[in-house]
């Protein structure tokens, strides 16, 4: 009886163990290596896999190079030295609006700050000149250097918008600026500044500044006064509108895919 009972217990335990034992399917019996899903490239012949990996490395390298180039920004740097002035200018078109100007002409420094801040350009200007005579030569040579720096920073002008248009108010003053980075220098200037000076700055030098900048940058620039009575407001609104229009023109258009924005396929001074 005891042997019979023990046998029954063992038989019952064995049945219970079988019920509790996890059931293994066919997939559980396969080697672990066989369960790894092969990628498309792993099923390719060895020489094709090597070529695919090479293309991937090249793509990553090009992407890194492009990112590095964008990080550096489009920068133009110019040094102009004459018997009258010593001027250095550096402009980053892809900057953040850093203004760093010391021209020896306080009001002009204030206007260059507007160019940097509202254009989101990094503008570095250092100048010494014969300001003991007047501001004419320093004002002119700074503008010539800025125009040349813009020309260098733009390069072949691939992918840019090319055109810029902006109207800026400053209290009672309202100034409209329209420009084209065409490679053809032209200035249309229509400001009526009521006073001869703002501080020590001769207001006649505003037109001369933009004419000099146009000559070396090769841009077509139109400046129109729609309203304004205060000389400071008129001039400052002009620089703000110019900065915003230039920012618009120099920014890249992703739809262009890096092509030159001209039906001729080229934008140049010649």
Swiss-Prot record:
It catalyses: D-erythro-1-(imidazol-4-yl)glycerol 3-phosphate = 3-(imidazol-4-yl)-2-oxopropyl phosphate + H2O. InterPro entries: IGPD_sf (IPR038494), ImidazoleglycerolP_deHydtase (IPR000807), ImidazoleglycerP_deHydtase_CS (IPR020565), Ribosomal_Su5_D2-typ_SF (IPR020568). Keywords: Acetylation, Amino-acid biosynthesis, Chloroplast, Histidine biosynthesis, Lyase, Manganese, Metal-binding, Plastid, Transit peptide. Its EC number is 4.2.1.19. The modification N-acetylserine is found at residue 63. GO terms for cellular component: chloroplast. Gene3D superfamilies: Imidazole glycerol phosphate dehydratase, domain 1. Binds 2 manganese ions per subunit. PROSITE patterns: IGP_DEHYDRATASE_1, IGP_DEHYDRATASE_2. Belongs to the imidazoleglycerol-phosphate dehydratase family. This is Imidazoleglycerol-phosphate dehydratase 1, chloroplastic. It comes from Arabidopsis thaliana. The gene is HISN5A.
